[in-house]
Amino acid sequence: MRQRDITTQFGALTLVEEDDHIVQLNWGASGRADASPVLDAACAQLTAYDAGTLQAFDVPMRVQGGALQQAVCTAMRDIPFGETLTYGDIARALGVSAQAVGQACGRNPIPIMIPCHRVMGAKGLTGFSGAV
């Protein structure tokens, strides 16, 4: 796996690439600056997103996990910039419980790029993995 650190308004982040796909975005720095076209593209897109000039990421990403994890991450990627859904909205669309959706959101391996921050509880913001 290749890794590269990037500093954003969200803090220090580490991108992890495996087999030409981003597979993780971790909070904090790893101290690594591996070379990779996918990491180059992901860093450029995160920088543009951070600057407010990008609204959707198109670098190749792969979510590791079961069918529910993959379905929830796909649903999160489909939420347009500037919009939000509730855990219940996604749960109804997938035919699962809101709690299961919340747990899958909490296990999002690529936060920011897979926008779990666009998913809220029925009464507003709940349980973030980042510094919110």
Spans of model-derived segments:
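Short Lys/Arg-enriched helix C-cap and helix-to-coil transition segments
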Residues: I112-G121
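Basic nucleic-acid-binding alpha-helical/helix-turn surface characteristic of O6-alkylguanine DNA
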Residues: M1-V96
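Residue-level detection of the helix-turn-helix DNA-binding "recognition helix"
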Residues: G106
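…primarily DNA-binding HTH/wHTH and HhH modules…
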Residues: K123-V132
